[in-house]
């Protein structure tokens, strides 16, 4: 897997010529190559804005919890939600994580579904463990995940995504 990291010129050090244009571009094959000032945004409990294409062909933006493992982005959703079908129809997504302490410090990750895991199928316990892990990351509460709809037998889907491109901006 290889992707491009595009570092935008920013105003953290004051005004500069060509600010807000892409400065350095580099090829990368792992998130380990990401500058730590952006990598930390992935590890903090920052709510991402997930961009997908809805059934009407327009972008749909959803605030949701962010997770990744190794060099894959993990996107979970309940199987009955429209978002699940929209992702199946168009597996390309974009995640935006903005530093809540400085909105001029962010990372954008474009990614595409590589595989879909279903909680109710063999291997589905991984989906449940991921949901429990992200629950603890964002709430500080121990498992199990505490937001399942009690009125239905809610089952979850996990989209495991490969990274296509990353854009970064600013400093903490």
PLM region descriptions:
Residues 1-33, 105-172:
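Charged, gly/pro-rich active-site loop segments
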Residues 20-52:
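Short, conserved active-site entrance elements at the starts or edges of catalytic domains
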Residues 39, 65, 85, 149-151:
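Short secondary-structure boundary/capping segments
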Residues 41-44, 103, 155:
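A short, polar/charged loop/turn motif at coil->beta-strand junctions and beta-hairpin connectors
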Residues 42-43, 88-89, 152:
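Alpha-helix boundary recognition
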Residues 45-79, 85-87, 94-98, 106-109:
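Short beta-strand segments
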Residues 99-100, 163:
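Short secondary-structure boundary segments
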């Amino acid at each position: 897997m290889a992707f491009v990291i595009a570092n935008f010129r920013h105003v953290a050090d004051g005004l500069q010529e060509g600010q807000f244009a892409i400065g350095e571009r580099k090829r990368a094959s792992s998130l380990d190559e990401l500058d730590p000032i952006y990598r930390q945004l992935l590890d903090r409990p920052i709510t991402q804005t997930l961009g997908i294409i809805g059934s009407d062909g327009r972008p749909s933006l959803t605030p949701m919890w962010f997770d990744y493992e190794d060099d894959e982005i993990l996107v979970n959703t309940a199987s009955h939600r429209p978002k699940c079908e929209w992702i199946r129809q168009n597996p390309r997504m974009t995640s935006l994580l903005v530093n809540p302490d400085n909105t001029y410090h962010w990372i954008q990750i474009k990614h595409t579904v590589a595989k879909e895991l279903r909680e109710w199928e063999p291997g589905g316990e991984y989906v449940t463990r991921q949901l429990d892990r992200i629950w603890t990351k964002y709430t500080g509460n121990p498992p199990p995940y505490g937001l399942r709809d009690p009125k239905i037998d809610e089952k979850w889907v996990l989209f495991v995504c490969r990274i296509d491109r990353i854009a970064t901006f600013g400093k903490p």
